[in-house]
Amino acid sequence: RGVAIVNSPLVHIGGVFRVLQCVAEARPFVLLERFELNAWTAAVRRHRPRAVSLVPAALRTVLHSDLPRADLESIQVVTCGTAPLSADDADAFTEKYGIPVLTSYAATEFGGGVAGWTLADHRRYWRVKRGSVGRANPGAALRVVAEDGTPLGPDEIGLLEVKPGQLGPDAGWLRTTDMARIDADGFVWIVGRADQAIIRGGFKVMPDDVRAALESHPAVAGAAVVARPDPRLGETPVAMVELRAPSTTDALVQHLRERLARYEIPTEIAIVDALPRTPSGKADLAAVRGYFAERPTVLRNHAR
């Protein structure tokens, strides 16, 4: 199976799982302290892995680099998890490097992954089910329920519950805070987090929808969206954005107006040099909230 490259930190289930998997399989691996493009590329060139795993932020770093296709010629598949990855970014990576991207769904409380794409499923279904995080892993079970626990039917949106295969056949259903839908073929779409919904004057704003719209702008390297208390509306969305190319808040707002409802547009967009991130590569939402809490409220309302 070749050498594995582990670039997820060992404080995260992704890094721990990969290392333990390699040890169990007597498989050699390279352990990087963190993802850094030059170090990762050097490891790929030297060890020529057939499969690599990248978190979305790392995948976008590779995608928007000048790394030539020849440097990744050994790689046959990229797996991607820990945070949402847009279908557009997955397709752009495949178009640029000729490598399919297999997204997955996992959490520390599950002891690892519970759903994901196989290469066979990707070849057969990706065009019609793009954006899904795949189907339940062997031994795992997933369902969508209403708030009272009533199971919902195919394509109905509700709370995702999981029986992880890692916990054995007698495991009970674990309720997540993720909103999801599952189609008749068992493919899962994560549509947001119930505990992160922003209620703006009675209107529900899903931060992941706003983040995805911001990250669809070609100048945006990454974005994070959180709620800020508002004395009149209760709370409003605000956004922090890291750029890869020059742009302005006005340009970003115009981009959002073409994709979102007025109430979904952040009341403030802060452009920063780099998004704060957790060791696993996710945006550090607590740090983002702290940033906006320390700033005076900007009077300009982009939603108007």
Residues covered by each model-derived region:
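Beta-strand->loop->alpha-helix junctions that form or flank phosphate-binding loops
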Residues: L102-E109, G134-A136, V226-R228, A270
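AMP-binding/adenylate-forming catalytic core of the ANL superfamily
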Residues: V52, L159-E161, G172, T177-E264, ...
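Active-site glycine-centered loops adjacent to acidic/histidine catalytic or metal-binding residues
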Residues: T82, A106, G134, D178, ...
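Acidic/polar alpha-helix N-cap and adjacent early helical turns
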Residues: G290-R304
